[in-house]
Amino acid sequence: MKNNHTSLKSPLDEEDELKTDHEIDLEKGPLPEYDSEEESTLPPYSDHALVNNPPNTHRENHSYRTTDNSSPLLIKLLISFTSIILFNAPAVCYLKYKDAFFKNYGAAEWTLFGFWCLVCTLALIFLTYFYETWTKAVKVTVISLAKCVKVTAIFLAQCVKACGKGIKHFLKKWENMPMAFSEVFLFNILVGSPRMNLRYIFGDRWGLKCSLADHIIFVVLSILVFIAETVKPGSIRVNLIRKMGYEAKQQVNEYTAVPLREMNPESEA
């Protein structure tokens, strides 16, 4: 069945449409060639293209706006003035302590005070003008000092930890040294106690020689003990309490050990 479609447009309307099709939009430029065979593409300046790609008017409107994150002038002046006050505070406190603040000022003192006020004013202007620069420098300096303090604290903590380990290792390795030196000291007392009798028997000359020999023996024995403990730790230790306790424990285990047959006579059956 054929669909007979008759156009209701007049010839004048068709001529107007042809004219509008051939006219060039001055704002959009000439229309590019449109390939009707490609179904995925749409003709330019179509309504669908305008919906998908709206004009970027929002970006253009905000392109000329610049964000100003700088501090207001009043805050800059306040911070700069506060820094100058803090810088001058020690001098004012010193003059107050000496009771010489605005007292007995002569021409030279007032001239110096005026010059100092001029320097402070110039410093205030300089700090206000270069506010971002010096505040950034102060922040970097504070952060660097904090890092230095942190590194120093970590280093000291590691040093203390290493010293603690060294002392612990030393005490563990040389725990027998006090016992050995106490034995040598006891030997020195036992041998050196009769020095007065030696002097009385052999005279001052031989008694002095015996006394010196006593001290030399003590030093030599101490050095030998130290060398022996260095070469082989525990070789000179005489820990009688531990040794006696260990032997007593062994004897108790030997005498109190009961065979399993006597403890469990039922096991034989």
UniProtKB/Swiss-Prot annotation:
Gene Ontology cellular-component annotations: vacuolar membrane
GO biological process: meiotic drive
InterPro entries found in the cross-reference section: WTF (IPR004982)
Basic and acidic residues bias spans: 19-30
Localisation per UniProt entry: Spore membrane; Vacuole membrane
UniProt region (Disordered), positions on chain: 1-67
Membrane topology: Multi-pass membrane protein
Chain ranges passing through the membrane: 73-93, 110-130, 140-160, 174-194, 216-236
Pfam families in the cross-refs: WTF
Domain of life: Eukaryota
Keywords tagged on the record: Membrane, Transmembrane, Transmembrane helix, Vacuole
Protein family according to the UniProt entry: Belongs to the WTF family.
Function noted in UniProt: Acts as a suppressor component of the dual wtf meiotic drive system, and can suppress but not confer meiotic drive by compatible poisons. Wtf meiotic drive systems promote unequal transmission of alleles from the parental zygote to progeny spores by encoding a poison and an antidote from the same locus; the poison is trans-acting and forms toxic aggregates in all spores within an ascus, wherease the antidote is spore-specific and targets aggregates for degradation by the vacuole.
Subunit-structure text: Homomer. Interacts with other proteins that exhibit high sequence similarity.
Name listed for the protein in its UniProt record: Meiotic drive suppressor wtf5
Organism the protein comes from: Schizosaccharomyces kambucha (Fission yeast)
Taxonomic placement: Eukaryota, Fungi, Dikarya, Ascomycota, Taphrinomycotina
Gene name for this UniProt entry: wtf5
